[in-house]
From Swiss-Prot:
SUPFAM superfamilies for this protein: Thioredoxin-like
Origin superkingdom: Eukaryota
Subunit relationships: Interacts with the G protein beta-gamma subunit complex (STE4-STE18 complex). Interacts with CCT2; this interaction leads to inhibition of CCT complex mediated actin folding.
Protein's organism: Saccharomyces cerevisiae (strain ATCC 204508 / S288c) (Baker's yeast)
Protein name (record): Phosducin-like protein 2
GO biological process, one term: actin cytoskeleton organization
UniProt-annotated location(s): Cytoplasm
In-chain residues carrying the UniProt-annotated modification Phosphoserine: 35, 62
Gene this protein is translated from: PLP2
Additional record remark: Present with 7700 molecules/cell in log phase SD medium.
Length: 286
């Protein structure tokens, strides 16, 4: 007995039908590709959710007051308390505020040990009763004032010390720190944290050389972790009066964020060459 002939049945795999659903379930035809529209909607939903979650991160207390009519009262009050606690902790750590000029015998205490923070001072507990041994960022300038870049770095240190009072800025003449330290390596910038050297930089080439500005130095501070990228004290985050007024107008016209987002898809409209310290000098910085 001959086998019955096989008939080739043409199936439109893109068709949304009950028969195609059966074939997909049995693996006869592949699953339908996700709709591009559905993918776009999902991506937009995720973007909106992330924006909503982080909407208050860059707001200061005055900004939070302006949002009282738009935000859930309990949520906003809890967030204000969180921000106040952050400000209080920053104030507790803001104990420097100047550039400290030291000599070699003071280096270990004023730099290495100081960078250990509360671990060096003695373990303390935070508001939750947990031990707090947070370190301190210490920036050290091995200086030679006859060099232009060293004078530039001294000026940057002075400005940064006044603004970021929780960071310790220390300056020491390079030849006092290390005998016969090469003048070509000056200025040298060393960053300590929790007793360790986490970054060193020979001359200001990495910042911009003779054209180094405060914005460049602040960017460096962010990169080494000494300052948070969203810190309102940074020049790049500072609002001028015009942009602040625009932001007030923007939030004044917006409906409550927590009441739901309508029309949410209408978006988009309207030293060494390698910058390291010579091995012979490593022992001094431990």
């Amino acid at each position: 007995m001959q086998n019955e002939p096989m008939f080739q049945v043409q199936v439109d795999e893109s068709e949304d039908s009950e028969w195609n659903d059966i074939l997909r379930a049995k693996g006869v035809i592949p699953e339908r590709a996700p709709s591009p529209t559905a993918k776009l909607e999902e991506a937009l939903e995720e973007a909106i959710a992330k924006q909503h979650e982080n909407r208050l991160e860059d707001k200061d207390l005055s900004d939070l007051e302006e949002l009282e009519d738009d935000e859930d009262e309990d949520f906003l009050e809890a967030y204000k308390i969180k921000r106040l606690n952050e400000i209080r902790k920053l104030q507790e750590r803001s104990k420097f505020g100047e550039v400290f000029h030291i000599n070699k015998p003071e280096y270990n205490k004023e730099v290495t040990l100081a960078s250990q923070g509360k671990k060096y001072e003695g373990a303390q507990t935070n508001d939750n009763g947990e031990e707090d041994d947070g370190g301190v960022y210490v920036f050290v300038h091995l200086s030679l004032q006859s060099k232009l870049q060293s004078r530039i770095l001294s000026h940057l240190f002075q400005s940064a010390a006044c603004k970021f009072r929780e960071i310790k800025f220390v300056e020491i003449p390079a030849n006092r720190a290390i005998e016969n330290y090469p003048e070509s390596n000056c200025p040298t910038l060393i960053v300590y944290y929790r007793g360790e050297v986490i970054k060193n930089m020979i001359t200001l080439l990495e910042l911009g050389g003779n054209n180094s500005k405060m914005e460049d130095f602040e960017d460096f501070m962010v990169k080494v972790g000494a300052v948070a990228e969203g810190d309102n004290r940074l020049i790049m985050n500072r609002d001028d009066e015009e942009s602040r007024e625009e932001r007030k107008l923007h939030y004044g016209e917006k409906k409550s964020i927590r009441s739901g987002i309508r029309g949410k898809f209408n978006v988009g409209i309207g030293g060494n060459d390698d910058g390291n310290i010579n091995d012979d000098d490593d022992g001094f910085f431990d």
